[in-house]
Amino acid sequence: MALIEPFRALRYDPSRVSIPQVVTQPYDKITPEMQDRYYAASPHNLVRVILGKQQSSDHAGENTYTRASQFFRDWRRQGIFLQDTQPALYLYVQRFTAPGGTAELERRGIIALGRIEDYSAGVVFRHEQTLAKPKADRLELLRSTRAHFGQLFMLYSDPAGEIDGLLKPGCDPDMDLRDQYGVWQRVWKLSDPSVIELVRSKMRDKKLIIADGHHRYETALAYRNERQAAGAGQTASTPRERSSSSASGQPGAQGPAPHDLVMMTLVNMDGPGLVILPTHRVVHGLQSFSSAEFRAGASVYFSVEEVDSSVDAARATVILREAGRIGTALLAVTPDRVFLLDRPKPVDPSFFTGWSLRQQALDVVQLHNCLLEGVLGISEEAVREQKNVRYIRDIGEAMAQVRSGAANLAFLMNPARMAQVRDIALAGEVLPQKSTDFYPKLLTGLTIYALE
């Protein structure tokens, strides 16, 4: 049972700041160069809170987390943020053209508070593993600020589009901007109690899959457990108690405590605007590499066909798409040759120990087991720590790194299909690292959920 609640969001006051100058991409997509640009854009850019710069004088009493807390408190006191007076859901619409595409697409989501559930409850499902260090970082920020600044990207299934059909704002958006990638981002506040209750009712039988935000979800889960262990509020035990919080818009009155909830954007996985981009693998730092030896090794696992070595990014994309219609297909770009690898050959089942048949059907599992480890000898640990593998979204950049001599070879990929992600997640399984890249990302700072 997916339980969602409206809330009184904190939002930037557009009379005090320029919204495009203060919102950001998700914290884990912010490069050092982007961080510098965000700092320069506005003294109130949210990067100072979600990913502040470290200073050489930092110590336990003053550091990025204490500064984040101070910025957040100061901006609230100064009126940089305003809290909505009524509990609401927020319609979030993104219109965009995907990289490499031509069609304009639209993705609609609902910003709401969602009940934090243990994975064992069978309500929220993950599709990737998490790492301890990012979770420790986000937990320290949450403890310091007691607020959620970005939404978790959550997927639900609604083939008939019933929930999207309820979201008809009928007015100009509250927020309207284009981000640095040209994505048109708009937000409407939906405060009609009847619409809110209809959406909540329709969501109750849904299962939720985390698209982006696994580390933040597990951080919120850890924080909830901390607060409950400290006796800071008890979770409501019945649907009636849970729903009562929506009347006042203040979670914790009779329903879930504030720490039982986390901010989410809920997107229909069956909608036309859901895009997953491929993440290409660039291999570097090998002591020796030979195109001929690689081809011989790859031939043990795949049918190998050499293609024109001068192929460009556009043509490579077409080749991959066509070959991928019938199953696994990869392009291996070496300094002097390009190979199409498809039609995987039978291998000893022990080669995929620990992987289900669902997982084995993924191109990325075939790549990691057969090619990275089987042919090139790059261990799972080395892949996880990115010792010999870089992850690149742009296919042209991946090819250029090889042709410039900066890398040994690149593996160009097709994206994972949503059906694969869904089936693996609902089975309680996970995909390898960097298997999905949902596009576009959700902006951070459009709405903020303050726990106190």
Regions inferred by a protein language model and the residue ranges of each:
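Surface-exposed, charge/polar-rich loops and edge strands
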Residues: M1-E452
